[in-house]
Amino acid sequence: MPRALVTGAAQGLGSEIARRLTGLGYEVVVHGRDAARTEVALAAAPGAVGSVTGRLDSLASTRLLADDARGRGPYGVIIHNAALGPDEPRQVFTEDGLDRVLQVNVVAPYLLSALLNLPRRIVFVGSDAARAGRPLVDLEVPQPWDGHQVYADSKLLLTMLAFELAARHTDRPINIVHPGWVRTRMGGPRATLPLSDGADTPVWMATSDEAVARRGGQYVHKRRAEAAPPAAHDATLRAALVDRLADLTGEHLR
């Protein structure tokens, strides 16, 4: 079976995705942001073949993570699940001078995509909050800062990144999935979907041979392609975003 890398696999959706992939026979490598979380991720996915550890709110740490992950590949599937949620209480700037939500949710997936060998499939875990996002292609957050708005912004930018990568590699399924409002630590107890339902479409897009799962450049919910936010289809905006990310990281998408 193919090897799969799942970021943010210590809890919630990422943990369930990793567990289900191992159950399907995939050779899963799990990621946690520190040693303790990585151990939790391994325990939650019996049968995982390896792990990588690294913070995504640091360019240096993300580079080391990519080096480690590359040595544990190659991968047939990469699932970019790790993210900060909408309930961050205040704006935090990272050691790289970036808004922490944007760095974890957008810059880190870009850098990993630029540094890792391209797998056969990529699944980005997005959110329908992207529809309320602003295309902040310069990665500068207007004030006053609002956690829910910046989360929405980050998920729109991630959708744009997924569509740009898909446009560059039309020979493989590269997609973004909106899993729904899932009862996780991020989603909260009032969320409408159990964890198993939230993980269903990301896992299906990573593994299925059905037509939707074999196409790229889609915004997928409940195993169906839906209309993406308009900015995802704007090639000029997407180019501006990846140019900014390339300048920031010094790495270019293939």
State where each predicted segment sits.
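Conserved glycine-rich cofactor-binding loop
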Residues: 10-11
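N-terminal Rossmann-fold NAD(P) dinucleotide-binding loop
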Residues: 14-15
